[in-house]
Curated annotation (Swiss-Prot):
Encoding gene (name): Jhy
GO terms (BP aspect): axoneme assembly; brain development; cell differentiation; cerebrospinal fluid circulation; establishment of localization in cell; motile cilium assembly; regulation of establishment of planar polarity
Biased composition regions of type Acidic residues, renumbered to the chain: 72-85
Gene Ontology annotations for the cellular component aspect, listed alphabetically: extracellular region
Skewed-composition ranges (Polar residues): 340-354, 410-438
Keywords: Cilium biogenesis/degradation
Protein name in the entry: Jhy protein
UniProt note on tissues of expression: Expressed in the brain, specifically in hypothalamus, pineal gland, and ependymal cells of the aqueduct of Sylvius, as well as in the choroid plexus of the third ventricle. Expressed in the ependymal cells lining the lateral ventricles (at protein level).
Length: 770
């Protein structure tokens, strides 16, 4: 099993594509000095292959380096800013291929070797033993690299500026490079204890011409700019000897890889991302004009590398706090230049502070919220204002003009970010008057512009909000006059310096026109505010009949005067009855007359708006008339009476009071129904009795008459029969009567039996049997 030494991990997307790196065979270990020789040799050669071949070979080399790397925490994602820098540097590096294409063709053929692309994807059963044996090797190799890097760190700053690269390219053209100069170019991340021996073996630096050295030194400086931001993470010596991690760390790391939820908040990846963001922010915000300041800041950064992470974090927090204070002071001075009825000495730069402490605290909180979205331009302005207090008013005027230009550029070209960046670079005096701009650094300027394009967009958005807040603040209605409007329109020309008037006259005309178009935008709101008022409609109709050639300032002044007159007349016409004090409406008849007049004058669009508002007013008038009628009829129909009605609201649960009231109402209804039923029954009985008496009287009268009539009728006489027949009938009747009676003997038998049974029953009763 092979034992490898730890190799410093490079950024995954480097600006220089190493297509000619020789990959060592798997038989011998992968040493750091071989890798340095390959890097130095390849960085001074140009690419002769096409871009797809470069990308393929670089991906193979990156896979091989990741396979040899022994650091466990190499799972990181590349930021989109690194990919943009890689693309830009690739385009810059392609310009140097034409000079060295012939030399590179011969070397390429001999350096390509067949390798296994998928070696890192195959399963290795001895992965645990490899890791355990690789960790002591990493611990042994740390002290030497830390010492060498600490010795050579003061020679190469962490953030190399453009001036040292220019000086190296111009001054050391014909001389052989010393190890110190090479260390300053390569940076502290490529230093090792055997670096001098590798530089002696590599004699390719001395064979190059002056132009080749010039171009390659600038290319190396560009490369080191991107890689220097990762020094704190990838350098073992920058943070002292690395501690040996326990097995529990790797268990948690594997859990994180498998996607299990981890409660750990301060993981290595999060800390590294925070540190990388801080170094990226510092790298963007560090270009200052004076070279002395640059060297001092670089020395401070070198000192910061030996500090503890906590002390470093506290120092960064202090710097951020100072930056917030400078930014708040700069915003206060910038907002003081805005014309709000101020005097002439305030317009000339002497700004009396009339704000209260509460307003200042509110503004500071607002700036602290939007602090991360601001770019480096405001930082440079605030630093210059602090260092040069005599030039502060002029800088404030320049930043005010620049904010207006940023707003105009963002409104006209929101779909083209490259054009926006070009306009900000051409219009902004801070960028165009840079002291260290040179033709050699045009590509660096483009890269710097791309890196802060997002910040510039956020800053333009902040400037636009500031301008809108200033322009759309509620103006005092009765104090606004024509002179103030004229001063407000002429103030950008007043703040403009004489050196800037000539190239920026066209731009100020555009901003002046945009502010003019923004001012009448308050008119529709004023119209909707007084829609239901008759007098104001008359004034608006007269203002609409004005010719279109009138300027917006005069129209605004006339509208203000008309509003004042309308309010004066409304104070006289306001009704005194006033059931509701907030409703101010004229009589309905005059409203209809004004509607008929306005229909003949206004356009169809205004007719629709007016009809809608008139319908709303008509409904209000109907309600008002109903209330007046109620007031005339009853005393209780007042506003207080209406407010006191139906005030009680039901709760969420059952309302026992309402249930009890309903039950009482039902009982009362039943009682009333029963009373009604009884009353109806009584009424029916009383009415039926006279009817029966009448019928009985009628029947009795008829019966009486019939009986009286029957008494008067004589009885018929029986016929005279012979005597024999009469005797026969008498004898037959007597015989029938005698045959029907029972015999006497039978009757006696039954009677005696009855007596015996009576005695037996009496005996049973005596014996208590029955």
């Amino acid at each position: 099993m092979n034992k490898y030494k730890p190799v410093p991990k490079l950024s995954s997307q480097s600006p220089v594509h190493h297509t000619n790196l020789r990959i060592p065979p798997s038989g011998r270990p992968f040493k750091k000095e071989d890798f340095l020789n390959l890097i130095s040799k390849d960085s001074l050669e140009s690419d002769s292959e096409s871009l797809p071949q470069e990308a393929k070979s670089w991906s193979d080399i990156k896979d091989q380096i990741q396979d040899k790397d022994m650091e466990p925490d190499s799972l990181e994602e590349d930021s989109p800013s690194e990919t943009e820098e890689a693309v830009n540097r690739k385009a810059a590096h392609n310009t140097n291929r034409e000079d060295l294409s012939a030399h590179d063709a011969g070397v390429n053929h001999s350096q390509h070797q067949v390798e296994d692309k998928y070696s890192d994807l195959r399963y290795d059963p001895n992965w645990k033993n490899k890791r355990e044996e690789g960790q002591p090797l990493a611990g042994e190799a740390l002290p030497g690299s830390a010492d060498s890097s600490s010795e050579n760190l003061p020679l190469a700053p962490l953030y190399p500026s453009r001036e040292p690269s220019m000086g190296l390219s111009a001054g050391k053209g014909k001389e052989k490079k010393s190890p110190q100069s090479e260390a300053s170019l390569l940076g502290s991340e490529f230093l090792s204890p055997k670096y001098e021996r590798s530089t002696r073996q590599n004699g390719f630096f001395s064979e190059l011409s002056d132009s080749d050295q010039e171009e390659k030194s600038s290319g190396l400086s560009q490369y080191l700019k991107s890689s220097s931001s990762h020094n704190d993470v990838f350098l073992p010596g920058s943070r002292g000897p690395r501690r040996r991690k326990s097995k529990q760390y790797f268990v948690e790391k594997n859990k994180l890889t498998l996607g299990l939820p981890m409660p750990k908040t301060d993981s290595y990846l999060q800390l590294h991302n925070k540190k990388r963001g801080e170094t990226r922010l510092e790298q963007i915000s560090y270009p200052v004009r004076d070279t002395d300041k640059m060297t001092v800041q670089n020395d401070k950064e070198v000192e910061n590398t030996f500090m503890d992470p906590e002390d470093k974090w506290h120092q960064r927090a202090k710097q951020l706090k100072n930056y917030q204070e400078h930014l708040s002071q700069y915003e206060d001075t910038k907002s003081g230049n805005v014309p709000r009825g101020q005097s002439s000495d305030a317009a000339n730069g002497q700004q009396p502070s009339r704000r209260t402490a509460k307003a200042r605290v509110r503004k500071q909180r607002k700036h602290q919220k939007g602090l991360k979205s601001l770019g480096t331009k405001e930082l440079v302005v605030s630093q210059n204002n602090q260092n040069n207090p005599f030039q502060q008013p002029q800088n404030q005027r320049q930043t005010a003009d620049a904010s207006a230009k940023h707003e105009l550029a963002a409104q006209t070209n929101a779909s083209n970010p490259n054009l926006q960046d070009a306009r900000t670079l051409t219009h902004n005096p801070k960028v165009t008057s840079d002291s260290f701009v040179s033709p050699k650094q045009a590509l660096d300027r483009a890269l710097y512009k791309n890196s802060i394009s997002g910040l510039n967009a956020n800053k333009r958005r902040g400037h636009r909000r500031e301008e809108e807040r200033i322009l759309y603040q509620p103006q005092p209605i009765y104090v606004f006059s024509d002179t103030h409007l004229q001063d407000f329109n002429e103030l950008p020309h007043r703040h403009e310096s004489p050196s800037q008037r000539a190239p920026q006259s066209d731009h100020h005309m555009n901003t002046h026109r945009s502010t003019k178009t923004k001012k009448p935008a308050k008119q529709p709101q004023a119209e909707t505010k007084y829609k239901n008022i008759e007098m104001l409609w008359k004034f608006h109709s007269s203002s609409d009949m004005e010719p279109a050639s009138a300027s917006p300032d005069s129209r605004l002044a006339q509208i203000m005067e008309q509003h004042q007159q309308a309010l004066m007349q409304l104070a006289e016409v306001q009704p005194s009855e006033g059931s509701l004090a907030s409703i101010i409406l004229p009589p309905i008849l005059s409203r209809v007359e004004s509607e008929s007049q306005l229909n003949s004058e206004r356009s169809h669009r205004h007719q629709v708006k007016m009809a809608r508002s008139n319908s709303e007013g008509y409904l209000l008038q109907l309600e008002r008339g109903k209330r007046h009628r109620k007031r005339s009829s009853t005393k209780s129909s007042k506003l207080k009476g209406y407010q006191k009605r139906d005030v009680k609201l039901g709760g969420l649960g059952p309302d026992f009071a309402s249930v009890r009231d309903k039950m009482q109402m039902l009982m009362q209804q039943k009682e009333y129904a029963q009373q009604v039923k009884d009353y109806n029954m009584k009424a029916l009985s009383i009415l039926s009795k006279p009817q029966t008496s009448k019928t009985e009287s009628k029947s009795a009268i008829s019966r009486k008459k019939a009986l009286d009539y029957a008494k008067t009728i004589p009885k018929p006489k029986p016929p005279n029969l012979p005597d024999q027949t009469a005797k026969k009938t008498k004898n037959s009747r007597h015989s029938e009567k005698e045959g029907g009676l029972p015999e006497i003997s039978l009757l006696e038998i039954l009677q005696s039996r009855h007596e015996r049974e009576k005695q037996a029953v009496a005996a049973f009763k005596v014996l208590h049997i029955v």
